[in-house]
Every structure is written in C-alpha cells, then in structure tokens.
C-alpha cells in the first residue's frame, strides 16, 4: 500500500474500554498516547480519558507525532431524537474539526443491545420501515452538516445494532445519499456474517463509499462460546472475541489488496477491544504494527 495515501492509527479501546470502564482503568491518557507513538502509529481515535479541549489535547498529541482521526458518535434517529442528535453532532463535529480530523464515525444506537446483557446474536434489534426512514433522513442531514466543515460522515456497522448485517448495511447504503459513507470494520463484518467471504463481499460492494477503516481480528473459538452460551457483546469482548490483526482468524492480505487496488485514501485504524489485563495493550499494539508493516508495506 502507498504510504502517501494510507496512514495508520490506533484506537485507545485496547488500553481502556469506554463501555466497560473497569477494563484498563489503571491506564492513564498520557500512558496511552505515549505507547501509541512508541508502537509506531501516527493517529489516534478519541477515548473517554482524552481532554476534550483542543487547546489542551492538541499539544499533547503534537509532541508525540499523533493526530486525531475520528471519534465515535452515537445517533438516535430511529428513536425520534432527531433534534437532540443533530445538536450534539454539531458540537462533536466542531471538536473534531478543531483537531484536524476529516471523518466522523457514527453508530445508530436506537434499540442497540451492545451495552446490555442480552444475547448479542439471538436478540439483535431490527428496525421497522418507519425507523429506517428516520435513520436514513437523519444521516442525510448529518452529511450536510459535516460538509459545512469539509468533513464526511461514515456509518459504523456494529454488532448488537439494527445496522449490523450485510443486508442491513446494503439497505442503509442504498437508501442514503452518496455523500453518506461507510466506516468499514473488518471485525464486526466477520463476527456478524461468520465468514471471510462475506466480510470481503461487504468491503467490495461498498468500496466507493468507504471513508474510514477499522482493522480488528476475531477469535473464532470465542465467537463459538458466545453462540453456545448466548453471551452478550460485552461478555464476548471480555473473553476475547476481538484481537489485533494477525492474531485471529481473518486473512488481511485481500483486505489490503482490495483497498490498495481501489486507490483508497485515508486512515486504517487498529480498533481491537479486549481486556488489557489479559492482552497487554502496548505489546498488542506492537504486534499489530509489525503485522501491518509485513502485510501491507506500511
């Protein structure tokens, strides 16, 4: 892959988990960003321990050669919370714009079970036609608001949400305008569909509208536990559903080739949440960086 087109970032979720603050509570912001830089990454997404004042955050990243590339934003259009979502989005957009980011990754969290004790596979939510309409209209509006600052919006398909499966992603992309993009996540695509083939099919089908990429690997044996024991999304994470590229079942070589052949420009982000007490974040960041260097040439 071309280093002039594609840059590498890593998310702080491997150090400390915003959905389960007890995981990695001992890891400070300063430690997190220092270890990211030491591991050889040049970008970061935003976690709960990050200062939200750009005047404070930016110098701390600048001295480490890091920049902010995205920050999770939860939308609630299907619930009918349009105005509240739009107001909060504008504040979020302005923060990311001040930090120099070009992408805003959003997840539609109406009916989401990702933070609950419900079985992530058996009890996933589904939208009615009206909820789909509200979501599509909302994301079309987000794209306009993002464009005011020269930014783009990407939908983060996610386990435990109503936009998770290939079919649901297809419907979302077909119904939204072309200026609404997809934040493609290898781990969530594989986890949802259960195969490398289906994950690659999602990537190839929506290649022209992918504006951000999350790289995470999957441990099949843990997914089997999640299915057999009807576990929640977060319980699966604690047991090790996800890991860094090269440490699980996914073959990333075709992912890198497809993106490279398409002329993809932007960030690839190692975003692999697991229990830092079981998987040392710095060691796993180094492992991911080594694998990507060997397999993507970055």
Swiss-Prot record:
Reactions accelerated catalytically: scyllo-inosose = 3D-3,5/4-trihydroxycyclohexane-1,2-dione + H2O
Quote one Gene Ontology molecular function term: manganese ion binding
Give the Enzyme Commission number.
4.2.1.44
Cofactor(s) it depends on: glutathione; Co(2+); Mn(2+)
Q: Please list the GO biological process terms of this entry.
A: inositol catabolic process
Coiled-coil blocks: none
UniProtKB keywords: Cobalt, Lyase, Manganese
- Family per record: Belongs to the IolE/MocC family.
- According to UniProt, the name of this protein is Inosose dehydratase
Q: Which organism is it from?
A: Erwinia tasmaniensis (strain DSM 17950 / CFBP 7177 / CIP 109463 / NCPPB 4357 / Et1/99)
Q: Which gene encodes it?
A: iolE
């Amino acid at each position: 892959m071309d280093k002039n087109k594609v840059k590498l970032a890593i998310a702080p979720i491997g150090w400390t988990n915003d959905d389960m603050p007890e995981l990695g509570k001992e890891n400070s912001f300063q430690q997190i960003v220092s270890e990211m830089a030491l591991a050889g990454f040049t970008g970061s997404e935003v976690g709960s321990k990050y200062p939200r004042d750009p005047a404070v955050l930016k110098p701390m990243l600048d001295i480490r050669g890091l920049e902010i590339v995205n920050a999770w934003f939860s939308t609630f259009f299907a619930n009918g919370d349009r105005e509240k979502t739009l107001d909060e989005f504008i504040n979020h957009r302005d923060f990311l714009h001040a930090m120099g980011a070009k992408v805003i990754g959003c997840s539609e969290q109406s009916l989401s079970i990702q933070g609950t004790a419900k079985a992530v596979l058996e009890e996933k939510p589904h939208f009615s036609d009206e909820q789909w309409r509200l979501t599509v209209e909302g994301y079309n509006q987000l794209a306009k608001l993002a464009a005011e600052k020269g930014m783009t919006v990407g939908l983060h398909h996610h386990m435990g949400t109503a936009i998770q499966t290939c079919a649901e992603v297809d419907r979302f992309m077909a119904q939204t305008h072309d200026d609404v993009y997809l934040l493609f996540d290898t781990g969530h695509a594989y986890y949802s569909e259960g195969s490398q083939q289906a994950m690659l099919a999602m990537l190839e089908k929506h290649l022209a509208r992918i504006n951000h990429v999350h790289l995470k690997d999957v441990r099949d044996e843990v997914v089997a536990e999640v299915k057999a024991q009807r576990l929640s999304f977060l319980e699966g994470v604690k047991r090790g559903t996800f890991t860094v590229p090269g440490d699980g079942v996914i073959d990333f070589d075709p992912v890198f080739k497809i993106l490279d052949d398409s002329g993809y420009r932007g960030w690839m982000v190692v975003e692999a949440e697991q229990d830092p007490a079981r998987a040392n974040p710095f060691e796993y960041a180094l492992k991911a960086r080594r694998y990507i260097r060997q397999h993507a040439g970055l």
